[in-house]
Every structure is written in C-alpha cells, then in structure tokens.
C-alpha cells in the first residue's frame, strides 16, 4: 500500500487471467487501477467484480496489437490521468506449435511479435517521456519462464518474450539515472484463458 496507494497503475490485458488478478491486488492497495482489453463485456464484468469487492477499476477498450490504437490509448490516459506511475505490460498471446508445423504459418510469428513485443514497446515508449519529465515511473513486463529454458513448440511465444526481455535490460541501463525503473517477471505456466485452447494443460 505504501508503494501504490494513490498512484495510477495501468494493467494491459487486465480483464482476465494474470492481469485481472494483479489489478485486484493493486486496487485493494489503494491504487487508481486502470485496465484495458479488447472485449468490452469482459471489461464490464471485471469492473462489476471489483465493485462487489468494495473498490473500482477504470476500464478502457484498447487493442495493444494495433499500433494506432496504442497511440490513441496512451494519449487518452495522458489527457485523463496525466499518464501513469506504474505500467504493467501484461497483454500477450501464446502459441503452442512446432516449428515444423509453422513452415506455412509465418503469421504465427508476426502476430505474436506484434502483441508481445511491438505492442508493449509502443505503449511503454508512449508513457516514457512523461515519466522521464517527472523523474519517476516503474514499468513491469510480464514475461515467461520459457525465456530461461528451451521450450519446444513455443518458439514464437518465447522469441517474442525474449525480445522484450532484451529490450528491457537495455532500457533499464539507459533510464537508470532518470528515475524510471524496470522489472521483468518470468512467470511460470499459469492456468488462464490464454492457455485454455491447449487441452494438454487440463491434465
């Protein structure tokens, strides 16, 4: 509570899974908790759940895989909230498919990079100028333990997260003396809607 109370926290992909669980924790601690996602119904349901628990979310529809929508969304939050104090880059896409099965599916790699890497960068770089000007800000990137291993069938997903991890290490060194800090969390496998299509996980 001493860290986020009264602060503006944005959780991308905050309408379900890890993002929603994190959003509840931030709101419980007194943060102005903003969530975004593509599905308005899920956003509404998340807000209803928060209200039932005695706090509230501020919800915005946004598609982090769409660069123009990222720009629109960042500008909207700067106008409405003065930017954010904490950015949780959680929105992501996972694909479980062998490389051999992807020879004619190069779009698997493109769409995974679009959301997991380029989208995160677009949002982050949109908020960085204000963070630097205020000399404060913390960016948390939700990555994967797969980056630390050699996970078969997850090359598209792991590569996109590895790219984000590498960028974050570089950014952390560049902004270390400007009041902006970065954290990477290499999450293990978590049972969320994102992994639901893979029936293997049910066992």
Model-assigned labels for residue ranges:
Residues 15-16:
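Conserved glycine-rich cofactor-binding loop
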Residues 29, 149, 170-180:
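Active-site-adjacent segment of SDR/Rossmann-fold oxidoreductases
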Residues 40-41, 61-73:
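The beta1-alpha1 cofactor-binding region of Rossmann-like NAD(H)/NADP(H)-dependent oxidoreductases
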Residues 94-110, 153:
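Conserved mid-core segment of classical short-chain dehydrogenase/reductases
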Residues 124, 160:
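Active-site helix of classical SDR
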Residues 144:
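Residue(s) in the substrate-gating loop at a strand-loop-helix junction
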Residues 173-203:
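SDR active-site lid
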